[in-house]
């Protein structure tokens, strides 16, 4: 049984195993607080993410289970990796990952990026996406604050809590507005890996310009700003809109012509503009894929087809349509944690763990 230590961070109780010391807050998200810490076992700095009340509702339980399964499955140099996971006596879940010094949002607000950094960061984002997409996963919430970077300029994509299966029937608004693909705004349903390419294009443009490309004040304004630059969506894209209200809105907009991006990005490398043109395309089917983008001339200094791996197997989404009670998600979560720590689930300890789920008395680190 692990020994747990409590600390107050921003009024939130962090209850972590004694393996981790020197807690310092580094970020707050909608679903959890992240602290830096030192791993006593390895001597390395780590990030500890507390998932708030993971078992309070079936929806939150499923979301936490999904993020855990994804972090366990996705193993790639440009994806954040899970080094530890545990459930505290208070039944909060903690994910422990490597700690990177900053994120792209902080970098972009501090200074303009030089060309070689823009190239290298974009290359690593696309290299990570090639792997993620090959696993049958769509991130859905790519934005500069989800792109972590260390002092060596190594880049890792994080926060897979919103990620979903590649599925023609996806729903809802999920990504931060500035980076949201038009098909999410227009259809609310049918979208796929291409939404991540659009988001990456918006991030790429922000690296080139030093400010967001489409800073919409709301959803309507967001779409209007997009059409000012990229023109009115083609008819075949408009025909895919499912919502009658959205369809009326789009048809009410004045007809606009697409502006050459070279006019907006006057100081950018022509190859950079060409790649951006291929990423920011209304029709998802005509948008460049991660694999194709990696082979683009702009990324030739870094492109190496022998070192841009795909996933060995697809992610198992069989749980995703399940509508289960909290206690069942809890049992599944504990099972995943036991598996992560290579604990035999047939032994007496794991039996005791399962029996004690309702009371939250059994905890493994």
Swiss-Prot record:
Compartments, record wording: Cytoplasm; Nucleus
A GO cellular-component term linked to this record: cytoplasm
First-tier enzyme category under EC: transferase
Keyword Flavoprotein: no
UniProt activity-regulation remark: Activated by tyrosine and threonine phosphorylation.
Tree of life domain: Eukaryota
Catalytic activity: L-seryl-[protein] + ATP = O-phospho-L-seryl-[protein] + ADP + H(+); L-threonyl-[protein] + ATP = O-phospho-L-threonyl-[protein] + ADP + H(+)
PANTHER family in UniProt: MITOGEN-ACTIVATED PROTEIN KINASE (PTHR24055)
Family: Belongs to the protein kinase superfamily. Ser/Thr protein kinase family. MAP kinase subfamily. HOG1 sub-subfamily.
This protein's name: Mitogen-activated protein kinase hog1
Organism expressing this protein natively: Aspergillus clavatus (strain ATCC 1007 / CBS 513.65 / DSM 816 / NCTC 3887 / NRRL 1 / QM 1276 / 107)
